[in-house]
Amino acid sequence: MPKNKDESQKAIVRTYYIIEGDKIKLKNKKCPRCGSIMAHHMKPVERWACGKCGYTEFIGKGK
């Protein structure tokens, strides 16, 4: 465990964006419920998930 909160590993925000010419574009989707950036998961089922509010969008065919 880190001694201070500052010593803990933080997310690298610069990996969330792509620079295209003079525009900055977000790589991932934004959560429609709370507005934070969602994570894309492939296993066990492909889905977009929000770590802040728990919102999940499943991708692909339903069984």
UniProtKB/Swiss-Prot annotation:
GO biological processes: translation
One MF annotation (Gene Ontology) recorded for this entry: zinc ion binding
Keyword Zinc-finger among UniProt keywords: yes
Cofactor binding: number and manner: Binds 1 zinc ion per subunit.
Domain of life: Archaea
Keywords per UniProt: Metal-binding, Ribonucleoprotein, Ribosomal protein, Zinc, Zinc-finger
SMART domains hit by this protein: Ribosomal_S27
SUPFAM superfamilies on file: Zn-binding ribosomal proteins
Positions with a binding annotation for Zn(2+): 31, 34, 50, 53
Requisite cofactors: Zn(2+)
Pfam families from the UniProt entry: Ribosomal_S27
GO CC annotation terms, alphabetical: ribonucleoprotein complex; ribosome
Assembly and oligomerization: Part of the 30S ribosomal subunit.
Name of the molecule in the record: Small ribosomal subunit protein eS31
Annotated source species: Sulfurisphaera tokodaii (strain DSM 16993 / JCM 10545 / NBRC 100140 / 7)
Gene name of the record: rps27ae
